[in-house]
């Protein structure tokens, strides 16, 4: 559907009623989804009902079904679990139970149902929808409802959102709750690492995932675990010997700890369970290592949702409401999923069918097929884990030397990218150098060769272990060229922010003057500002958004306690408003001022009046975000003075400048993983390019496509030549001319109850799940 006009949209919701429920196991981010469905529903003029206690509340009716207003879902976005309750319901699996549920929905005039839950809950919803007509006939026959009512409510629309920490649903890159569960697992691994190192221990960590190894796989990849057990890929026979050999080997190389990660559903080739206690006993008996088991259990479901889960849930929930409004008698029940950074609608039963096929493949011991059916990203994660976990000597030494450096400001995930690039390069037989202190270090000859074990333990470290500088190559080209010649460097991998991109562009433009610069170059965008052209996500921006979000959560709590207080919070990001916008959505801010969305004094007046109106309700707190360079004259101090003066007698005002807090401590699971993947993919690309341009015993690369930025664009990882990106770059303000996340600002304003035109909102199309669509790697 094309963009929708606000008036038409508001009319399309009028007279409709939407019921929202959470079912099955809880997942962090469900509250953000409930909030967004409720507010979007009310926004378009529909009535919204919160159905408490999942399907149980639907069957029992009464007080469990309550009409919601705008304030019903205030201040819940930061809470874990689900505030409307969830239950596993036996009654709904029977025809009588579903008949009672249909009766309760008709009583409230609800014919649109948004179900947030796992595949079981969504399958139940689809059965309910297919039986709807016959259930109403039975209710008419019993005299419980009139024929007129049955005609009025003759059709039930279903839109599903997948809430499950296991990420076990086919057709979506991420389910609601998965990212937060990974946060909990990584927090535990980081904490365990310090005690394990102190005592030279081995830890066996058991994570959730009875039928799906996603959490185990990604946390193993993000922590550099020594061994991994997942149900989709049982270990080869004789694995006990291999595992003990590998653990012994890492210890003999000086490592003080071993980490083994096991999914609770891990099995061997014969389908027999492998338990964490069995693995522990094995290590103790064979190696005599001090070994402990930690079962994470329900810790993984707990805690506050991560920024990714809050934004993902809000985006999907808006799309679900649109899907319900646009549904006709012929549209199938759909589920809203994530593909890259796009929300997509898929037929519910196609996804459920594919999900069941994975299980069937595992039951039939077709394990390779099971991994393929899990999707391209899962398969890619698995292959990268196998590549990086253990050093295998290269088949042959190559003649190539590569150098890796960090440029710009420190960003979380830089070290993960360097580690994986170093190890991939070594496994391909290349000589790998690291350069300290960016281009300046390259000019001064601060270059050293690096080995496999030199980068051990780098994954979870924040900042930049190599040291990073903002200096560009321009003033020191002679010295840089000299050192490239001395060390015989054939390729450069530059991990960094806008300066990394600009620096490589300068080197490429100097190729005509210096033949030594006719080498292969690649930029991995790493900056908290997310302002590098050629990618939708820069490394480090997820950690920065989470750091800003945690600070804002605390600030909001302070405002709640004080009553009638507004906080103005300044975020970093240069001219790029990504941090302010995404943090704003994640914390439910009232406004976020950014450079890309120009505003004038009239807009500020509207905002202040909006805040004054808000203070008359039960929500007596406000939070306004401001990007540091959003306006030359409307500074943070100006906004503080304006809000203080206009709000006099109604609310008072305080400011907070978050500053370098936003560079974050330890990288988030997303950044560790994304960095690891970009490092591997960039190194594989460099290796391939080097082979292509190797002529007569030397490397000569001068084609535009020999110097690229690697990044995630929409649904896939892409390489864009720096010379082609030049025309798409605003060098004055250091950012791309077009930015995908500006479409998220509609959601920010709508959820803060601003009247806006939805003309720019583009709904997701209904697509289909096939083995081909599953095979794409989206980088998650």
Curated annotation (Swiss-Prot):
Its main location: cytoplasm. GO terms for cellular component: 6-phosphofructokinase complex; membrane. The active site is at residue 166. It is found in: Cytoplasm. Mg(2+) binds at residue 119. The modification N-acetylalanine is found at residue 2. Residues 2-390 are annotated as: N-terminal catalytic PFK domain 1. GlcNAcylation at Ser-529 by OGT decreases enzyme activity, leading to redirect glucose flux through the oxidative pentose phosphate pathway. Glycosylation is stimulated by both hypoxia and glucose deprivation. Substrate binds at residues 164-166, 201, 208-210, 264, 292, 298-301. It is an enzyme of class 2 (transferase). Pathway: Carbohydrate degradation; glycolysis; D-glyceraldehyde 3-phosphate and glycerone phosphate from D-glucose: step 3/4. Belongs to the phosphofructokinase type A (PFKA) family. ATP-dependent PFK group I subfamily. Eukaryotic two domain clade 'E' sub-subfamily. PANTHER family: ATP-DEPENDENT 6-PHOSPHOFRUCTOKINASE, LIVER TYPE, PHOSPHOFRUCTOKINASE. Catalyzes the phosphorylation of D-fructose 6-phosphate to fructose 1,6-bisphosphate by ATP, the first committing step of glycolysis. Negatively regulates the phagocyte oxidative burst in response to bacterial infection by controlling cellular NADPH biosynthesis and NADPH oxidase-derived reactive oxygen species. Upon macrophage activation, drives the metabolic switch toward glycolysis, thus preventing glucose turnover that produces NADPH via pentose phosphate pathway. This is ATP-dependent 6-phosphofructokinase, liver type. It comes from Pongo abelii (Sumatran orangutan).
């Amino acid at each position: 559907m094309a963009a929708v006009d606000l008036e038409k949209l508001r009319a399309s919701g009028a007279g409709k009623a939407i019921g929202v429920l959470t079912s099955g196991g809880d997942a962090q981010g469900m509250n953000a989804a409930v909030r967004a469905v409720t507010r979007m529903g009310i926004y378009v003029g529909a009535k919204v009902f919160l159905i408490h206690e999942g399907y149980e509340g639907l069957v029992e009716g009464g007080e469990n079904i309550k009409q919601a207003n705008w304030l019903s879902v205030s201040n819940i976005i930061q809470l874990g679990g689900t505030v409307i309750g969830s239950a596993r319901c036996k009654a709904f699996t029977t025809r009588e139970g579903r008949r009672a549920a249909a009766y309760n929905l008709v009583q409230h005039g609800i014919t649109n149902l948004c179900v947030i839950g796992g595949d079981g809950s969504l399958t139940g919803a689809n059965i309910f929808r297919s039986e709807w007509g016959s259930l109403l006939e039975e209710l008419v026959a019993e005299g419980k409802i009139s024929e007129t009512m049955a005609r009025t409510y003759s059709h039930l629309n279903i839109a599903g959102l997948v809430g499950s920490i296991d990420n076990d649903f086919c057709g979506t890159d991420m389910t609601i709750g998965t990212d937060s569960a990974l946060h909990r697992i990584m927090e535990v691994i980081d904490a365990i690492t310090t005690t394990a190192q102190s005592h030279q221990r081995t830890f066996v960590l058991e994570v959730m995932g009875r039928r799906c190894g996603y959490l185990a796989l990604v946390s193993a990849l993000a922590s550099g675990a020594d061994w991994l057990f997942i149900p989709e890929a049982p270990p080869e026979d004789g694995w006990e010997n291999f595992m003990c050999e590998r653990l012994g080997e890492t210890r003999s190389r000086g490592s003080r700890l071993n980490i083994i990660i096991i999914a609770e559903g891990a099995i061997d080739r014969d389908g027999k369970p492998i338990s964490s206690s069995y693995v522990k006993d094995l290590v103790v008996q064979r190696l005599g290592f001090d070994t402990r088991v930690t079962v994470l259990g329900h810790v993984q479901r707990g805690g506050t949702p991560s920024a990714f889960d809050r934004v993902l849930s809000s985006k999907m929930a808006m799309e679900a409401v649109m899907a319900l409004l646009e549904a006709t008698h012929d549209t199938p029940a759909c589920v809203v999923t994530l593909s890259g950074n796009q929300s997509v609608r898929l037929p519910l039963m196609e996804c459920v069918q594919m999900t069941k096929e994975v299980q069937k493949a595992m039951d039939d011991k077709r394990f390779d097929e099971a991994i393929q059916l899990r999707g391209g990203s899962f398969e890619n994660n698995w292959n990268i884990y196998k590549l990086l976990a253990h050093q295998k000597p290269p088949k042959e030494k190559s003649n190539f030397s590569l150098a890796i450096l960090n440029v710009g400001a420190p960003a979380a995930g830089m070290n993960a990218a360097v580690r994986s690039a170093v190890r991939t390069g070594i496994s391909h037989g290349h000589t790998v150098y690291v350069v300290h202190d960016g281009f300046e270090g390259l000019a001064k000859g601060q270059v050293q060769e690096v080995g496999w074990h030199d980068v051990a333990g780098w994954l979870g470290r924040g900042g930049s272990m190599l040291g990073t500088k903002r200096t560009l190559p321009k003033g020191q080209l002679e010295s840089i060229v000299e050192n490239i010649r001395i060390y015989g460097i054939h390729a450069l991998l530059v991990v960094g922010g806008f300066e990394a991109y600009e620096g490589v562009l300068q080197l490429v433009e100097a190729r005509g003057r210096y033949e030594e610069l006719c080498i292969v170059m690649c930029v991995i965008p790493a900056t908290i500002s997310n302002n590098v052209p050629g990618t939708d996500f820069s490394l480090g921006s997820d950690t920065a958004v989470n750091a800003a979000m945690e600070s804002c959560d605390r600030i909001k709590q302070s405002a709640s306690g004080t009553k009638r207080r507004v906080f103005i919070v300044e975020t970093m990001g240069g001219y790029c408003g990504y941090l302010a916008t995404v943090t704003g959505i994640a914390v439910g801010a009232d406004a976020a001022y950014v450079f890309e969305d120009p505003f004038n004094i009239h807009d500020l007046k509207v905002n202040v009046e909006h805040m004054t109106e808000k203070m008359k309700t039960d929500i007596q707190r406000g939070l306004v975000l401001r990007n540091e360079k959003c306006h030359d004259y409307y500074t943070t101090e100006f906004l503080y003075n304006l809000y203080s003066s206009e709000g006099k007698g109604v609310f008072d005002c305080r400011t907070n400048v978050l500053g370098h807090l936003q560079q974050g401590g330890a990288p988030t699971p997303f950044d560790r993983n994304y960095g690891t993947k970009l490092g591997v993919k960039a190194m594989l690309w460099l290796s391939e390019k080097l082979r292509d341009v190797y002529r007569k015993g030397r490397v000569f690369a001068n084609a535009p496509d020999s110097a690229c930025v690697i990044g995630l664009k929409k649904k896939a990882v892409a390489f864009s030549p720096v010379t082609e990106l030049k025309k798409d770059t605003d060098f004055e303000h250091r950012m791309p001319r077009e930015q995908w996340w500006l479409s998220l600002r509609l959601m920010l304003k709508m959820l803060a109850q601003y009247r806006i035109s939805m003309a720019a909102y583009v709904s997701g199309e209904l697509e289909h799940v096939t083995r081909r669509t599953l095979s794409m790697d989206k980088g998650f």
